[in-house]
Amino acid sequence: MGLVIFVAGRYLLWPPQPPVSSTPATAPGETPVTVSPTTRPASEPDATASSVSTKYGGILRLADRGDPPSAFDPMRTSSIALHEVAGALFGPGNLVMRSRENVYQVSPYLARTWYSSPDFTEWTFVLRNDVLWHDGTPFTAEDVKFWFDLALFGYEVDGKIRAPAYFKGELDAIEEVEVLSKDQVRIKLNTRNRFFLEILADPRLKFAHPRHLMEPRLKAGNVSVSPLDIGLVGLGPFRFEKYEEGSVVRVRRFDRYFETDGQGNQLPYLDGIDYIIMTEPAAMDAAFRTGRLDGGARGVGHYLSEERMQGYIRDLGDRVFFAEMEGGNFRLAFNVLKPGPWQDPRVRRAIALWIDKEAAIPSVLGGFGWTSPGLGPLNPGKDKRFVVWPRFDTAPLEERRAEAKRLMAEAGYAEGFVMGHISRAQQPLGGQFLKDQLKGLGIDLQLEVVDEAEWNTGRVSLDYDSQQGALTVLPIPEGTEGVYGRFSKSPDSYAKHEDTKVDDYYRLLLEASTTERRIEVWRQLQEYIFVGQTYVIPIAEAIYVVPYRTYVKGLPVPAEDAHTHTDFATVWLDKSVK
């Protein structure tokens, strides 16, 4: 696995890699309507002549950037501090998952096959019959219905209310989940959606709520019951063993896990994983370089900068490799539901024109990022025609800033104003960059630096004037309503608005029958959000870099979205490599 480094205006691969053959990927959304494989080969990017027996065993030691928040509940947070652990406990997907071989394709997971109605408004899933919860209870269609109902509608008993999942907006088209038999469920949608599988394959949507353990507690009035309260009983390749707050999360192999590799050998290979909680990136770097870690943490702040990566290369040479993934977008988003000058679209537009986007790459993204898709890392599976935002606002910075000043004066704010901004303590560089940038426009950006607990609740509230957002956009346009949609449908959306025209664009996307029409509508939608209304200002695309020891083998590295493939079921430790 190589690393793409931005040097002298272009990207270079380090270390140099031999040519690798690849199978052309199908376009997102072009998966067959009916799929019925019984096995799925595990990713083996580091195949050797080692016998299968040598792959088994060992404890993988990974850094985690913080304690998993929200009592380990994936319905309450998308934090990577949870989801780096959640993949091992709860699995890499739900009914379906992103393929380990190609993140843009959908593979079976808990469902072994599925089919849709001709108009894509009904999807029927046939479940595997060999899936067990970690306490030995069989997984059934009743678990599926329970999870979807809990995520979509929450729960109410004796006047106590449990809120729906934060990602409800992604699944808002679901009208009903019907149990057909012990191993079959039918999901009915209120609109056609031939991309429903790709949306469902979002790795944040994890089954962490076993009906047989959760439902009795809910009926008894404990509407806040969490996965931690019931012992973190999941469906993933590893079972929960121990959690010491501020120290470590330990998981160990679940011997009755259902997945096998391409040769029929049971997964996972590892005996277990220890997630060492390290809130300081410097502590992680020191632990890795002194042999106390096998892999770094995922998460902004802990991803390597160019300077930190050079330290790894200097000290470890060929004993380290770097997993590189396209990350999320560094952005500024507005709460237009809160009174203030930012409710005027001219003001928001002025801010978008004023920001020097390229300056964010070294200042905020550690040197790894891009503002033009032509400069991004090689990614043959991604259709760059859907990468629209860099094509807006391409005039020279001086011209853009002159127009920004004019718009501010026209809106009556030539002297500027004060605007609040919720900023994560774990990643202060973004907030400081925005504050420094907007000072020249006369805007005093008041940074409200918060811990992870307040960040996870504050960003889904209407309490703050602006924010950077947290979620990584799904790889397909149809899966982005959860981050660009209306607040009432998607509380974790970047901007807080109630613009029904955005709903109309997503409806047109779902109705599109050709790739060309999808691209056309997607461009119109992005132009509306980023330019016409400027609810969100995309600034630069991040490239996430995570270090691993070279003896870590079988690691599927997603082309984008670091929440993907955190189950580590196919990972093994090559004992012949020191």
Residue ranges and their predicted role:
Residues 340, 349, 361-364, 395-398, ...:
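Extracytoplasmic/peripheral linker and loop segments enriched in polar/acidic and small residues
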Residues 97-101, 201-274, 280-283, 401-402, ...:
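Gly/Pro-rich hinge or "lid" segments in bacterial periplasmic/extracellular proteins
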